[in-house]
Amino acid sequence: MASSMRSLFTDHSRYVESFRRFLSNSTEHQCMQEFMDKKLPGIIARIGDIKSEIKILSIGGGAGEIDLQILSKVQAQYPGVHIINEVVEPSAEQITKYKELVAKTSNLENIKFAWHKETSSEYQNRMMEKKELQRWDFIHMIQMLYYVKDIPATLKFFHSLLATNAKILIIIVSGASSWQKLWEKYGSRLPRNDLCQYVTSSDLTQMLDKLGIKYEYYDLLSTMDISDCFIDGNENGDLLWDFLTETCNFNTTAPPDLKAEIMKDLQKPEFSIKKEGKVLFNNSLSFIVVEA
């Protein structure tokens, strides 16, 4: 590995920008929206039974776009019921964006929001110091378990916080996606970091099975348009390269042979499909619903 290569997580602003480019070039949020519309109402059908208020915990809530979709479904299921929505999010920038989104969104009068600038581990430690743990009716962890050091312990802890009829929704890249193939083949040749680990739904279901925790599992197709990655000097492509490889300025710091290998693989059918002149990377998502 060339010494000039460094993890994308060493440059927070570059990471945030590459993540935004990923979202704008992928069907990630559309895929989540489809799940929220078609599956979520059935999943939350009993979480608020005989309750005067519903407590929701968002772990890694980001800028809040998906959180507000979830809240709208809960409101529709339990009209007029008071909702407490607490958000655990380590990025101050994301919390600011979340608050801005709430401020300009209507029909949130029956929801009380609270934000905690901390990681899930910091939240866990803070709660463990308290004598009485808060119980939750719905906990969701959207695309955040990659940033947890001890995933089984995290799953076990948050499962212990579930109230009667409560559920946890976990969204993570599918074991059938191209991310797993990319990580398995090239992970050892890309910069190491302590902040993120390669984990997919395949790993997660094994962990849940080992813990004896019951869950339901759904897979939905999502794609990322990586066509710009094959255009020299394209800024959008450069940022997508960074996101794909979790490497800061991958295009200018990666050894030419490594870049050529990955570029060749990304165009193969096992990684991407070619449609209407676009190269679409398999970004399929898994939705895992954990029961109390």
Swiss-Prot record:
One GO MF term on file is: histamine N-methyltransferase activity
| Localization, UniProt | Cytoplasm
Q: Where does S-adenosyl-L-methionine bind?
A: 60, 89, 94, 120, 142
Which positions carry the signal peptide feature in this UniProt record?
none
State the EC number(s): 2.1.1.8
What's a BP term from Gene Ontology annotated to this protein?
methylation
- Residues annotated as binding substrate are 28, 283
Q: Does the keyword Cytoplasm belong to this entry?
A: yes
Provide the Gene Ontology terms for cellular component. centrosome; cytoplasm; cytosol; nucleoplasm
Question: What's a Pfam family in this record?
Answer: Methyltransf_23
The organism's place on the tree of life at top rank: Eukaryota
Judged by the first EC level, this protein's enzyme class is transferase
Q: Can you state which reaction this protein catalyses?
A: histamine + S-adenosyl-L-methionine = N(tau)-methylhistamine + S-adenosyl-L-homocysteine + H(+)
Q: What the protein does?
A: Inactivates histamine by N-methylation. Plays an important role in degrading histamine and in regulating the airway response to histamine.
Assembly description:
Monomer.
Q: Which family does it belong to?
A: Belongs to the class I-like SAM-binding methyltransferase superfamily. HNMT family.
Name this protein carries in UniProt? Histamine N-methyltransferase
**Species assigned in the record:** Bos taurus
